[in-house]
Amino acid sequence: MTELKTLLLFLATAVAEIVGCYLPYRWLREDGSAWLLLPAAASLALFAWLLTLHPAASGRIYAAYGGVYVFVAVLWLWGVDGVRPTVWDITGSLIALCGMAVIMFAPRGA
């Protein structure tokens, strides 16, 4: 799988997970409708399915995915929550992305 396809798949996976967790949050913390749980469940199912599309070992996928999740969560903070990330938020998320790149794209010995 090419690096770009891997990154795009991780981004889609992160959005699916965040939406799947955000909707119950809205229901519980912001008096949202219980109907929010239906798309939340679908989003979390999509998240789990997307994780299976990666060709690498599951442990490596989970470890690398964490870096992308951090980055997308900071974007969510800005775009959905309306909170501008600090320089430390951005720096930390970029470090996490670097960790993902090392885990996923480093040369592997035979």
UniProtKB/Swiss-Prot annotation:
Coiled coil: none annotated. The keyword Transmembrane applies. The keyword Transmembrane helix applies. InterPro entries: UPF0060 (IPR003844). It is a multi-pass membrane protein. It comes from the Bacteria. The chain crosses the membrane at residues 4-24, 33-53, 61-81, 87-107. Pfam families: UPF0060. It is found in: Cell inner membrane. Disulfide bonds: none annotated. Keywords: Cell inner membrane, Cell membrane, Membrane, Transmembrane, Transmembrane helix. GO terms for cellular component: plasma membrane. Its main location: membrane. Belongs to the UPF0060 family. This is UPF0060 membrane protein azo2656. The lineage of its organism: Bacteria, Pseudomonadati, Pseudomonadota, Betaproteobacteria, Rhodocyclales.
